[in-house]
């Protein structure tokens, strides 16, 4: 399972994101420290993510500016997940919807081959507009990165952290949680 998960989120080969939860705040949110770590995303890190030991993020854009996965990040705290799920289906968009850490949604696009990030971002922008979220974040955030000078793309938190008790899961047609 971990190997397939890593394959789905294949991106930058030289870095990943990592989040450590520090403590809970009064408003119910958690205080966390998020950093970019300049080591590859590995099966061991995926295991730690799925077990809840570490929160891991993946960088969709590779050093050659190609992507095999991408995402829309909709951070709307009053988001009606069922309505959004139905809209994705009605528009026949090839997106896998997951509840995000904030209670919004990450809508993932998985491709069978690597495609230039600029092309993917154009398609994501079209999909976001069709869904009524034209100003949401797109991952990759960059059309290109200058790998030769050490630039990296931005990372997105992966779903299913602490998979047995997660609040970050994929949603079926009825917006009910799907297990791994």
Q: Where in this protein do the model-derived segments appear?
A:
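Short loop/turn and capping residues at structural boundaries
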Residues: 17-20, 99, 139
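DNA replication initiation modules
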Residues: 56-79, 85, 90, 111-180
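Short, conserved phosphate-binding/catalytic loop or strand-edge motifs used
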Residues: 97-106
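DNA replication initiation on ssDNA origins
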Residues: 1-69, 77-86, 153-155, 160-163
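An amphipathic, hydrophobic-aromatic interaction surface with interspersed Lys/Arg
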Residues: 94
């Amino acid at each position: 399972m971990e190997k397939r998960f890593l394959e789905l989120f294949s991106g930058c080969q030289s870095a990943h994101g990592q989040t450590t939860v520090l403590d809970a705040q009064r408003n119910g949110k958690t205080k966390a420290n998020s950093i970019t770590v300049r080591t590859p995303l590995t099966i061991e890190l995926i295991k730690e993510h799925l077990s809840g030991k570490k929160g891991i993020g993946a960088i969709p854009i590779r050093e050659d500016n190609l992507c095999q996965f991408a995402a829309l990040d909709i951070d709307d705290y009053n988001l009606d997940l069922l309505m959004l799920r139905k809209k994705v289906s009605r528009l026949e968009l090839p997106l896998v919807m997951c509840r995000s850490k904030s209670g919004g949604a990450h809508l993932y696009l998985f491709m069978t081959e690597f495609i230039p990030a600029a092309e993917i971002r154009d398609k994501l922008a079209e999909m976001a507009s069709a869904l009524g979220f034209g100003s949401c974040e797109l991952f990759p955030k960059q059309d290109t990165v200058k790998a030769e000078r050490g630039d990296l793309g931005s990372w997105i938190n992966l779903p299913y952290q602490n998979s047995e008790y997660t609040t970050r899961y994929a949603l079926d047609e009825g917006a009910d949680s799907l297990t791994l």
